[in-house]
């Protein structure tokens, strides 16, 4: 299953620099507003050290990670819903994203202007949230007259009308659909931005990354959403380094892992996703499924025929397989299980599906 995250933020917050680091693309990242006009789209492999281990065990010719698509759009300014800056029409580029990643500037650099004149993360977060709420309110108010007409003719449309009216009330009160906990099913066709889960990237400098009290204050600003702290410029440098050099560089900074790795992992957790693995001489591959998915659904991610003709799944946990040293040893230890249609997949399951079509 494809996973797409839309990147939003004020101009000069570091969105395009982050996107460049994520995708290793050379997207224009300028120190003036609206450097990004058309959306930039990049597909990123999710770092997963388990793949290299499997490739060694199975002598795989290649590894294929799970992927995340990132969409970087123009900076949003206060009043965008009323036409300020570039307006908000470009938000359509992320309406079908699964989640929204808001990049918020924490670093202070006199050479990089702030559109509001001063660095203020709380104000920036409020600005973006307000503009997304207003954009959704415009969408809802545009569709309401049509729904009201349809509901008069077809009673089956009453539920949809009720859901949209409820969404209108929530948005008019300045709340997001997601935070209000509304049932998003009836609203799915509207692709409302605030119905999506949010995660927050705070773009810091190296001193701020080491400032735990500051990070706790920023984390509290967005709780219960996830907060990720990184320096987008440093992340851009890290992706150009050899792995050993990058690890040494991070260790000197007192950082456990690259911020980009944290972002990918948090994105999966935020959306309730997990990974299962397949391995063989041709390739070792990571596949994305929702948490709670049963074996036939996982099989269908590989190919619809696997789901239609599902018989059973041969499953071993990654940790058990590594401990055993080979599938042969894992079978001898009784660690390889045959699971049926009701088996709930676990993160890190190494699977071979049996099917018949």
Residue locations for each model-derived region?
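Conserved Switch II/interswitch segment of TRAFAC-class P-loop GTPases
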Residues: 42-47, 74-84, 95-157, 170-182, ...
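Residue-level signal for pocket-adjacent positions within structured domains
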Residues: 22-32, 39-41, 46-49, 53, ...
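Amphipathic alpha-helical transducer elements in NTP-driven molecular machines
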Residues: 34, 48-51, 64-70, 84-97, ...
